């Protein structure tokens, strides 16, 4: 919408707080902060420790934002919301004497810069660094109190050296299930050598040759290579993690089709930490919504592992309903299951139902045709297909509950990446199984009474029927009894299963961290020694991976780094002489650099370690005295979007726990407290074709919206939602800073509502924050002369009480991130001072200090004009006097038969009989009673008087 910017008129008083003056003040104080290192914060040890050797303050506060990706579009007004909120929080605690660490880096690896490089031939680093310069300029205008010395980008070689180092720590570790923690791989080897850990298969470590030993060790690593079914996106030329695929089976970035494909890929064994990732959610101060999302993503469920025997070996399934085993009338494997090719019969058994054959002459032909037919389907499409399809393998399995032979099928609704990739099908208890059985004419056996399985599956509680020794039991009892029978028969065991899959940790792109891994002539992977780090990303002649038709499911990835042959092929001495090796040509996913960056903020110049233990312990170590005995440690406040709940936040927790297990950090969680900020949204406008038009040019007229386009005025439709360049409703913070000043933008965004709530942007409302700051300015500065107005007058009682209520209220609000209510209290107090023409220093100085977290530039300038030298950034924040927080008098509404007829004010400590007497003497109450004697008078202390007549 078209708005008129605030600009000084010719008759504007010379010293009025205008956008021009605000800009001058802001630039001056930002320079002063930079020159003085105002926001530089000391570490206990290292290059950022106090030069005089003094100790750092015991009270600290580590505040962190989810750092931005430096896109080419720059910032719009929605982006700074969280950054301003954390700055207010950090400034408040800094003013209370805390040693506050607040810094901001950039998550700079990723697809957008690479795509731009492909299109233009410009190196991604060139584009990324230019974007970072612009981001720093835009964020710098906001007056954010960051320690600029601690800023970095994940693309900095000195940074990703330590990303590679962490990868090697995880690669060279294994998870000891007995101790429930990661341990160095050398300790596993030592146990094998000593014979305290069994190799398996009846062999000893001494029986194994070098290759077999390496294979055994590699199978235990927390990072491993696996031939697994992955999400292949031909349109992006790379594989994707499950978390990067949308619910409808497309890539989050680019919206390309994603296909399931078997490839050899790096995986991280995050599943080993499933229980700890779940359990430690209970000790985190995080939003319930995020905790629920992580719990659902990890998806812990209890049940039984069951083995169905076949001629080709056991088929293992996991079921949460072992009680229904007598109702398992067939089995289904994922088409990609390892056993499929071994189970396929050479010919159809006699009497095979034609519906089971897929129209093929042999089971092998049917399997091949079926696999080809589903190759282009996403996981979601496979699971949501209303028409059930499948192929009989010509093989049977033995149901361990009753010994019956059940046919084995493959079907697309069973996925290789979930559970064991095989199910026991109980059509009476699962609707998908029921649909499949109905489609293929398979038996449906009722095993839990309570429904009509001829109509649909029944999954509720009831009494067991048609279930042999389980008959008559309830479901819970039957689950336990069947599990015990399976254990006794050697055909199963109780088990916990998770939805969480291991983390696919490789991308066939260019702009990412290279793997610190090489392969020998036999194709075996070797982690590089730490002394060979960093492995720097080389320049390539062409940044693009071999791209494919987005629908070409049969395509194969070809990473750009494979083109740099003189980088790929190297001669190295890894401890056994100089030998030829080849480098891994994949790069790490975009989540790698953001999985540990909180640690680097604590020690950004350390060249010997990712951070000194003393610095990590100071900034992130557990503080049970402050946070309770179960405090996991971590960053004190982390603010960012809820969209990262099961991506960045889960991955960073996993990495941090591995580092904790290996003794590199003292905190077992990276983020003690998390707050998800809401979104700033705005109106957008579309013409009759659905095309967006510039929102700033739209005019509202007679309840309609028109756009004065090149062909004349056009009526447009209004919609509400995200802010973005593509929606043509983006408002730059530069524009608001130019027209009102950065402090006005800060106050406006913090005043819009609770931080966690989404809120609508309205440029026309910014003027309210602007006028508030003008009123604060006028209380201290004469607009005509520029003189400071502060006097040494004493404060009246009403002002004193309001002052101290405001101090107490804003302090509590700032500490609780309720910046909107803090602003409201400051506006109320400012209005009182303005209305009462209060110019007393005793009223103005606390106001300036309280305003400082919200509007720091204005506050600094006023503090200086009030005669103070130096910055107020380190306070002190005013303290409330408890004496003025207690009211001397109390106002009681007086009700007569339930309706308020008058009000009386009495001393706060007045006894009930005195309150009653005052109420009965109130003029309006006396008139209403008109001589009648009350039957009863009820005094509710501090609240009301009720007279019953």
From Swiss-Prot:
Annotated GO MF terms: aminoacyl-tRNA deacylase activity; ATP binding; leucine-tRNA ligase activity
KW Iron-sulfur (keyword) present: no
Localization of this protein: Cytoplasm
Binding residues annotated for ATP, in chain numbering: 725
A Pfam match: tRNA-synt_1g
Residue window of motif 'KMSKS' region: 722-726
Top EC class, one word: ligase
Predominant location category: cytoplasm
Span(s) of short sequence motif 'HIGH' region: 68-79
EC number, as in UniProt: 6.1.1.4
Keywords: Aminoacyl-tRNA synthetase, ATP-binding, Cytoplasm, Ligase, Nucleotide-binding, Protein biosynthesis
Entry GO CC: cytosol
Region spans: Disordered: 540-562
Catalytic activity: tRNA(Leu) + L-leucine + ATP = L-leucyl-tRNA(Leu) + AMP + diphosphate
GO biological process: leucyl-tRNA aminoacylation
Family annotation (HAMAP family): Leu_tRNA_synth_B
Family: Belongs to the class-I aminoacyl-tRNA synthetase family.
Name of the protein in question: Leucine--tRNA ligase
Record organism: Mycolicibacterium gilvum (strain PYR-GCK)
Lineage start: Bacteria, Bacillati, Actinomycetota, Actinomycetes, Mycobacteriales
């Amino acid at each position: 919408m078209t708005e008129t910017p605030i600009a000084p008129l010719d008759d504007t008083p010379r010293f009025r707080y205008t956008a021009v003056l605000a800009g001058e003040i802001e630039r001056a104080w930002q320079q002063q902060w930079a020159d003085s290192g105002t926001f530089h914060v000391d570490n206990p040890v290292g290059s950022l420790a106090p030069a005089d050797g003094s100790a750092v303050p015991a009270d600290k506060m580590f505040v962190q934002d989810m750092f931005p990706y430096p896109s080419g579009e720059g910032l719009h007004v929605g982006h700074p919301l969280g950054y301003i909120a954390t700055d207010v929080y950090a400034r408040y605690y800094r003013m209370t004497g805390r040693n506050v660490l607040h810094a901001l880096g950039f998550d700079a690896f990723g697809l957008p810069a690479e795509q731009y490089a492909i299109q233009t031939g410009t190196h991604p680093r060139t584009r990324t660094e230019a974007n970072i310069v612009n981001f720093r300029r835009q964020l710098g205008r906001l007056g954010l109190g960051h320690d600029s010395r601690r800023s970095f980008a994940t693309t900095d070689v000195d940074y990703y050296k330590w990303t590679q180092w962490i990868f090697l720590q995880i690669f060279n570790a294994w998870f000891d299930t007995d101790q429930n923690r990661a341990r160095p791989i050398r300790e596993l080897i030592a146990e094998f050598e000593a014979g305290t850990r069994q190799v398996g298969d009846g062999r000893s470590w001494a029986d194994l040759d070098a290759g077999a030993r390496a294979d055994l060790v590699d199978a235990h690593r927390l990072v491993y290579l696996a031939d697994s079914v992955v999400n292949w996106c031909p349109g992006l030329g790379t594989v994707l993690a499950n978390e990067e695929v949308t619910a409808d089976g497309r890539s989050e970035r680019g919206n390309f089709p994603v296909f399931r494909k078997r490839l050899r890929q790096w995986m991280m064994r995050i599943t080993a930490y499933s229980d700890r990732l779940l359990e430690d959610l209970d000790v985190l101060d995080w939003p319930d919504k995020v905790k629920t999302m992580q719990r659902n993503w990890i998806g812990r469920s209890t049940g039984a592992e069951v083995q169905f025997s076949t001629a080709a070996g056991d088929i293992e399934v996991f079921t949460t309903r072992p009680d229904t085993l007598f109702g398992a009338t067939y089995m289904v494997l994922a088409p990609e299951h390892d056993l499929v090719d071994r189970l396929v019969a050479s010919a159809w058994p006699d009497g095979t139902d034609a519906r089971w054959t897929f129209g093929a002459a042999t089971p092998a032909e049917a399997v091949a045709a079926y696999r080809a037919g589903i190759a282009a389907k996403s996981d979601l499409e496979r699971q949501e297909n209303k028409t059930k399809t499948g192929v009989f393998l010509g093989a049977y399995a033995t149901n361990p509950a009753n010994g019956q032979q059940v046919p084995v099928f493959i079907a697309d609704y069973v996925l290789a990446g979930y559970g064991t990739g095989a199910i026991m099908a109980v059509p009476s208890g699962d609707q998908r199984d029921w649909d499949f059985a109905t489609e293929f004419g398979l038996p449906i056996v009722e095993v839990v009474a309570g429904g009509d399985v001829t109509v649909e599956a029944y999954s509720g509680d009831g009494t067991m029927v048609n279930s042999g020794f389980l008959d008559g039991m309830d479901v819970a009892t039957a689950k336990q009894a069947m599990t015990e029978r399976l254990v006794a028969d050697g055909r199963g065991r109780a088990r916990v299963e998770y939805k969480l899959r291991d983390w696919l940790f490789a991308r066939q792109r260019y702009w990412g961290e290279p793997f610190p891994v090489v392969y020998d002539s036999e194709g075996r992977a070797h982690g590089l020694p730490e002394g060979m780090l960093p492995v720097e990303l080389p320049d390539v002649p062409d940044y693009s991976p071999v791209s494919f038709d987005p629908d070409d499911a049969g395509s194969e990835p070809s990473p750009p780094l494979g083109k740099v042959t003189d980088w790929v092929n190297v001669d190295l001495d890894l401890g056994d002489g100089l030998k030829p090796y080849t480098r891994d040509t994949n790069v790490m996913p975009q989540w790698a650099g953001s999985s540990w960056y909180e640690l680097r903020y604590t020690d950004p110049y350390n060249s010997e370690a990712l951070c000194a233990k003393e610095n990590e312990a100071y900034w992130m170590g557990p503080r049970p005295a402050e946070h309770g005995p179960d405090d996991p440690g971590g960053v004190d406040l982390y603010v960012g979007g809820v969209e990262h709940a099961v991506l960045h936040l889960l991955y960073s927790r996993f990495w941090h726990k591995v580092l904790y297990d290996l003794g590199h950090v003292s905190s077992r969680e990276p983020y003690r407290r998390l707050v998800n900020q809401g979104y700033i949204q705005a109106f957008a406008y579309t013409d009759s074709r659905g095309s967006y038009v510039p929102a700033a040019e739209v005019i509202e007229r007679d309840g309609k919206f028109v756009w004065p386009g090149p062909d004349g005025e056009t009526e447009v439709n209004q919609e509400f939602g995200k802010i973005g360049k593509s929606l043509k409703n983006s408002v730059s913070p530069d524009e608001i800073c130019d027209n009102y000043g950065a402090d006005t933008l800060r106050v406006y965004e913090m005043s819009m509502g609770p931080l966690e709530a989404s809120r609508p942007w309205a440029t026309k409302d910014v003027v309210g924050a602007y006028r508030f700051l003008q009123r604060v300015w006028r209380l201290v500065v004469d607009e005509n002369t520029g003189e400071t107005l502060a006097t040494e007058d004493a404060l009246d009682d009403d002002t004193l009480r309001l002052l101290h209520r405001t101090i107490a209220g804003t302090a509590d609000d700032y500490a609780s991130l309720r910046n909107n209510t803090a602003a409201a209290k400051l506006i109320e107090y400012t209005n009182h001072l303005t209305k009462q023409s209060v110019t007393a220093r005793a009223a103005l100085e606390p106001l300036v200090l309280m305003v400082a977290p919200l509007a720091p530039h204005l506050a600094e300038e006023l503090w200086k004009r009030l005669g103070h030298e130096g910055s107020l950034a380190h306070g002190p924040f005013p303290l409330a006097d408890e004496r003025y927080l207690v009211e001397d008098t109390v106002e009681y509404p007086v009700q007569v038969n339930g309706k308020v007829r008058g009000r009386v004010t009495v001393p706060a400590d007045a006894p009930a009989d005195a309150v009653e007497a005052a109420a009965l003497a109130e003029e309006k109450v006396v008139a209403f009673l008109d001589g009648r004697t009350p039957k009863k008078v009820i005094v509710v202390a501090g609240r009301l008087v009720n007279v019953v007549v």
